[in-house]
Amino acid sequence: MSEIVKFNPVMASGFGAYIDHRDFLEAKTETIKNLLMRQGFVVVKNLDIDSDTFRDIYSAYGTIVEYADEKIGVGFGYRDTLKLEGEKGKIVTGRGQLPFHADGGLLLSQVDQVFLYAAEIKNVKFRGATTVCDHALACQEMPAHLLRVLEEETFEVRVLERGYYVDVSPDGWFKVPVFTDLGWVRKMLIYFPFDEGQPASWEPRIVGFTDHETQAFFQELGAFLKQPRYYYKHFWEDGDLLIMDNRRVIHEREEFNDDDIVRRLYRGQTADI
């Protein structure tokens, strides 16, 4: 009989899983991985760990997605655990918005699990959330005119924050497959445009669409995906751990561009390779 771990659903639809930190630490990695495939994401509160313990935890889930050798410059040279500390002048590691996306696509890397841990949170209550979207359910219930575009049109993206992506990402525009059928789920790889006034790390386009049409599509799609049935918003507190199955959900970061806010997260990524 397969191991089980006690959890409570996060969302009214039954999606997501709250797990007590004691149960999480005692559970087998494989049990949590299987739960993630079904529930999409896991939230653990009050987990008191340092960056080494964080690495020990996430490294058990698969092959660490790390950037060494010819990829050593990625993320300004972070290698494995990326510290998201709200650096001025940076975007991915900065304080601005990161609109809906899945990890790995811009660096042509397979990323199956994403781990975020709150090392230090101060002076922020209702800003800088990480949000998670149940794209599989959303696509089942989506208006046909939106789904048709996702399934039939060609989506491209180009990176703008060269200091982060260095020369690992392709130059110029490149195609990103929106859906990849993995059998148990259709993985979604999509990069939403940044809001006006936000420094942009990437830029998407839809081949054959005007700028106006592209903007209108993403606005309507974003409004649909952000309905409470599909959308969870996590406001960070010290000791929070959020694990996402990168094939089962897409996520975003809301801006927290206030000098008084301290929002230090550790990020790890693993792949089933």
UniProtKB/Swiss-Prot annotation:
GO biological process terms, semicolon-separated: antibiotic biosynthetic process
List of residues binding 2-oxoglutarate: T130, R253, R263, R267
Binding site for substrate: G104
Pfam family, one: TauD
Requisite cofactors: Fe(2+)
Subcellular compartments: Cytoplasm
Coiled-coil regions, chain positions: none
Catalytic reaction annotation: (3S,5S)-carbapenam-3-caboxylate + 2-oxoglutarate + O2 = (5R)-carbapenem-3-carboxylate + succinate + CO2 + H2O
Enzyme class, first EC level, given as a word: oxidoreductase
Binding of Fe cation, residues: H101, D103, H251
Keyword presence, Transmembrane helix: no
GO CC field: cytoplasm
Keyword annotations from UniProtKB, A to Z: Antibiotic biosynthesis, Cytoplasm, Dioxygenase, Iron, Metal-binding, Oxidoreductase
Cofactor info, note text: Binds 1 Fe(2+) per subunit.
Record-linked InterPro entries: AlphaKG_dependent_hydroxylases (IPR050411), TauD-like_sf (IPR042098), TauD/TfdA-like (IPR003819)
Molecular functions (GO terms): dioxygenase activity; metal ion binding
Assembly, per entry: Homohexamer. Dimer of trimers.
Record-stated family: Belongs to the TfdA dioxygenase family.
Function: Catalyzes the Fe(2+) and alpha-ketoglutarate-dependent conversion of (3S,5S)-carbapenam to (5R)-carbapenem, an essential step in carbapenem antibiotic biosynthesis.
Protein's UniProt name: (5R)-carbapenem-3-carboxylate synthase
Lineage: Bacteria, Pseudomonadati, Pseudomonadota, Gammaproteobacteria, Enterobacterales
